[in-house]
Design a protein with these regions (language model features):
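Intrinsically disordered, low-complexity linkers and terminal tails enriched in Ser/Thr/Pro/Gly
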Residues: 4-9, 18-166
């Protein structure tokens, strides 16, 4: 019985700590932040936006890539030819009035061949304020609802090493 408790305890601790270690920084252009319900009346102005981020070490040509609403409205923006995102840069895209629904929206980034490169989790934004769904750190896999930071960093993830000096 004691062995069973020890095994279950180890599994519990591993399960709790695993998500913290399982999060990774992407090696491709990502959807870094989305505001599906910005302050104001979405039907009166083009105000919904998507921020892309390039965590790689190379320029990426986004010509013909698509940013798509995949739920109710199914509206797709095609990124213009000649659009380049440099390493570490952010690009903001607006499309048209009411691009997204405010509840249960999933946004996809597709390359010029239609291959899905990145997706958001299902997001809900009923606040009509200055908050957005964003990665907790630029390019990181966790998402949070926080004060919008369009075109700028959500924060950089810093890894620490436990190695001892020689």
């Amino acid at each position: 019985m004691n062995n069973l408790l020890i095994i279950l305890s180890v599994i519990l601790v591993a399960g709790i700590s695993a998500p913290a270690y399982a999060q990774t920084i992407s090696d491709h252009v990502v959807i870094n932040e989305v505001d599906t319900n910005p302050f104001g009346d979405d039907s009166q102005s083009i105000s919904e936006w998507v921020e892309l981020y390039n965590p790689t070490d190379s320029d990426v040509d986004l010509s013909g890539w698509e940013i798509a609403s995949t739920t109710v409205l199914k509206k797709t923006l095609t990124i213009p030819d000649g659009t380049i995102i440099s390493p570490g840069d952010f690009l903001i895209f607006n499309y048209e009035k009411i691009w997204f629904t405010d509840s249960s929206e999933l946004v996809e980034l597709r390359n010029a061949d239609g291959v899905i490169i990145d997706t958001t989790p299902f997001i809900v934004d009923l606040e009509n304020d200055f908050s957005s769904w964003q990665r907790s750190y630029d390019g990181f896999s966790d998402w949070e609802f926080s004060l919008a930071s369009a075109g700028s960093s959500n924060g950089k993830f810093i890894e620490f090493s436990n190695s001892s000096p020689v």
